[in-house]
From Swiss-Prot:
Binds 1 zinc ion per subunit. This is 7-cyano-7-deazaguanine synthase. The gene is queC. Zn(2+) binds at C185, C193, C196, C199. GO terms for biological process: queuosine biosynthetic process. It comes from Marinomonas sp. (strain MWYL1). Its EC number is 6.3.4.20. ATP binds at Y9, S10, G11, G12, M13, D14, S15, F16, T17, V18, L19.
Length: 219
């Protein structure tokens, strides 16, 4: 019987690669997505489609009821999504307060209920500058907490914590993954904007690998 693992799966290219990495590692994967009121909720539709195709368990948890407690982010509020490079300081407006701690806490609870020993999520080096809850010290602290918060110890696994977006893409391409089955743009429109930090980072990754992004862009 395969070991169970929960994968925090947004529908973006990082978590898509993590999801498939866990599957390739022979784990019995339970994908977990969250609706926290993000403008780019299209990612949840993509996540559901991928999980149906893979035939794996997928839960989408609606936590919009606590949205007012996680306010002041351009991803969930009225502020415009900033344009520019993903390491520019204006991208700090896309930080959702305490998001990954909240999401990982629920993922750990789900893992305990499943008797799963691992929770995977897609933190990577490109997020370290802007997002405190994607940094190595955060992962280390969450791992320490997850080992003592319940009778069952759960390990937080971040396969790409020290990898760039380009390196994540290379790992996925080596697995023959189709990145048309992902959504990255922070704007929730029909096509990717090509101007937000998330789009910039994605396009840089494809350029770094000498590949063309299969998604359509407005610009």
């Amino acid at each position: 019987m395969s070991e169970k693992a929960v994968v925090v799966y947004s529908g973006g290219m990082d978590s898509f690669t993590v999801l498939n990495t866990a599957i390739q590692n022979g784990l019995d994967v339970y994908a977990l997505s969250f609706n926290y009121g993000q403008k780019h909720s299209k990612e949840l539709e993509v996540a559901a489609h991928v999980c149906r195709k893979l035939g794996i368990s997928h839960k989408v948890v609606d936590i919009t009821a606590i949205n007012s407690l996680m306010a002041n982010s351009s991803l969930t509020g009225d502020a415009e999504i900033p344009e520019g490079h993903y390491e520019d300081d204006n991208m700090k407006s896309t930080v959702v307060p305490n998001r990954n701690m909240v999401l990982l806490s629920m993922a750990i609870a789900y893992a305990v209920s499943l008797e799963a020993g691992k929770v995977y999520y897609g933190a990577h080096s490109g997020d370290h500058h802007i997002y405190p809850d994607c940094r190595p010290e955060f992962v280390e602290a969450m791992n320490a907490v997850s080992k003592i918060a319940n009778y069952q110890s759960v390990e937080i696994v971040t396969p790409f914590l020290h990898s760039s977006k380009g390196e994540i893409l290379k790992a996925g391409l080596d697995m023959n993954l189709n990145y048309a089955n992902t959504w990255t743009c922070y704007n929730g429109r029909e096509k990717s904007c090509g101007k937000c930090g998330a789009c910039y980072e994605r396009l840089e990754a494809f350029a770094e690998q000498g590949k063309t992004d299969p998604l359509e862009y407005e610009a």
